Structure formats: C-alpha cells, structure tokens
Amino acid sequence: HRELILPQLSGPGVAAHLVKKLSGFKVTYGPIRARDLLVFLDTGLKATPEMRFKTFTTWERTELIPMELVGALKPGILVIAVFFLVAFLGRSEEGWTNALSHGLFSALAMLTAILVGAVLAPLLLPWLPGRAFSVKGFSVGVLFAAILAACYWYGWITSADGLEILAWLLLVPAVSAYLGMNFTGASTYTSLSGVKKEMRWALPLEIAGGIIG
C-alpha cells in the first residue's frame, strides 16, 4: 500500500502534499481517537461525525491535571525551600518557632497558588470569566487571594503580618494566572497565534506581579 493514516489532529503539523511528493505516500486523516481506528478501517476509511468531533469534558480535563501539577510542583518545591530559608534568616531572632510558622505559612500559600492554577482552573474552565486562559486562572486566583485576606482580617491568620498578606495578594493571582495560561497547551480549542498573542500581554503582567509580590 502507499497510504499513510494519521490522526486528524496531526493535520496542522503535516504538509500532505509534501509527504506525497517526497515519499509517494498518500495521507489520509483518520479519527481523532485511537479507539475509533478499527471501525474507521472496517468502514473503508470513512469517518462518522462523532469520530471528527473532539470533546473537552470535565473528566478529560481532569486526566490532564496530574501532568500539569507535576510540572508546576517541580519549580514550586524549590520556591518553597527558598521561602523557608528566607523565613529562618529573617525571623530567627524572633525565635525558631516563629520562623518556622512564617515558613509554613509561605509554603501553604504557594501550594495553594499552585493548586488553584493547576487544578481548579482546568476543572472550572468553562465557567470562569474571560476567553484567555490567563484571565481564567487569574480570576480563580483573585478569589482565593480574597479568602486569604479575609482570613487575615478576621484574625484567623496570625503567622503573617499585613505586608506578607499584601505580597500574597499579588503572588497568588500571578502564579494561578501563569498556570492557567500554561494549560492552553493541553486544550483542544486554542490556536498557536492566539496563545502567542495572549503571552505577549499576560506574561509581563504575571512576572510583574510575582516580582512585586
């Protein structure tokens, strides 16, 4: 045979006419999902509308979360270690218990920012405001930053001062916005040009929020 069956979603990265010219193989785009391939072959390479339609359900997004979470936790652990070091260096004169308390608070706040951006943003994706994924991540980050501020306001957080809370009001949305934007690579309906356009304005704001915080 001189026919090459490729997944439908490989289309944007394949120049079918060049494949034919250079190898002699005709490119046929098969179904989106591998599980439909046998039926596609049995029906004479005819795809049903269902084979051409890609869903992005809550469960399908949930399956992608472990990959996103592991990628976010690797640098996150290093940042948490730095926060502990800064807490011990800056608060050691106030006692090791106080230094440990500040370090733990910073670690929990950073983990919250990561979980918000890498877990909640993908799960709540269709219901979060905005079209840009960074805006979606930012919105859920702002919500949790507001909860953090409320906990401090009502005296439920005693291991951080007002300046630290202010810093986290900037850091949590910045981190969650970045991780939300990062999820565009796993989505089914974002375009390369759209992602590049979003990154041009979102990334500087996320970096600024992280640095100021």
Tell me the role of every PLM-derived stretch:
Residues 14, 32-35, 115, 119, ...:
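Conserved active-site and cofactor/substrate-binding residues in soluble primary-metabolism enzymes
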Residues 24, 42-46, 50, 129, ...:
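Generic secondary-structure signature for well-ordered alpha-helical cores
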Residues 32-74:
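Cytosolic juxtamembrane regions of integral membrane proteins
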Residues 65-151:
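Core alpha-helical transmembrane segments of integral membrane proteins
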